[in-house]
Amino acid sequence: VAAARVVLPAALQGLDRQQMTAAIKSAPLGRVDRKIALLRYVERLPLPDIAAQTHYSRTAIGYRLKSIEKMLSV
């Protein structure tokens, strides 16, 4: 699967993979949102693949990513 073009939130820009994982795990996110953030920003999966793995719709993943971005900047 080709890596998706992912625009990283400001809080994750310039971080390597390990630092990104640590930042996501330390953010105030729930279990599902943490998994979505890791799949999107660390694994760089496209939304349909994340939707398939989490059993949410692609649209729901998009909405959740918007709130995840806000939580990462807290």
PLM features: what roles do these ranges have?
Residues 4, 54-74:
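DNA-recognition helix of helix-turn-helix
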Residues 36-37, 49-51, 61:
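Hydrophobic positions on the alpha-helical face of helix-turn-helix-like DNA-binding modules
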